Amino acid sequence: MVKQLIKKFLTPAQVDQLYRRTSGIRARFSRHDLKKLALLYGSDKWGAHWYAQHYEHHFRPLQNRRMNVLEIGIGGEDKPNSGGASLRMWATYFPKSTIHGIDIYDKSFLQTDRIKIYRGSQADAAFLNGVVGGIGAPDIIIDDGSHQNEHVLQTFEILFPLLAANGIYVVEDTQTSYWPDEGGSSDDLNAPRSLLTFFKSLTDGLNHAEFIRPGYVLSYYDQHIVSMHFYHNLVFIYKGRNDEGSNRVVNNQIRRK
């Protein structure tokens, strides 16, 4: 009844403006529930996808910290004044953090004191280095960009080294690893340069101390990935110092008893 009256007396633009203002007020009462926040702001992280429950599990301990949160892909494509649902959601969920958004389209209308917008490509190393150089090391990076396998891998190779120590890197919509149109494959589940082939390969590095490979040279990922969590279409990668030793192996050789 109320919705019908509002639509009767207000233009679509006014309805949209009213909804945005009231959603912010309603969101304050649901600040600790990402599923509700996603629905309030219209983010596809709950409903179209089922990511909010996993984000809550990993992010809840960080909720009241002061952080730099960087999300690639703002949404709305080239439609004017469209997109930004998840940026608003993160700004509410992390009340002490600054939320940074990257998109190839102009999304400057979303800029606020706590939401910062940058226009450029996620595959442009100079652009990404410039953004991080300006804002400092992100504590959380979320890749919700083009989802093309090549772009996802290029972005990770550029940004993971720039992620803060003990930071979290998230890749959404990993189903494109199986889609040929996006550079993936369902026939070869170990296709070279498939994004999940790459991320699965990094799991062995968690146990580099156990390799029986004398002279083995550690990669950056061996040294700095401390855990990985795989969900339906979603991967979390934790950064830290992966320097736990083995109880049997020394310098990649078995220690004789």
Which residues fall in each region the model found?
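A short alpha-helical cap/connector motif
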Residues: 1-142, 146-171, 175-257
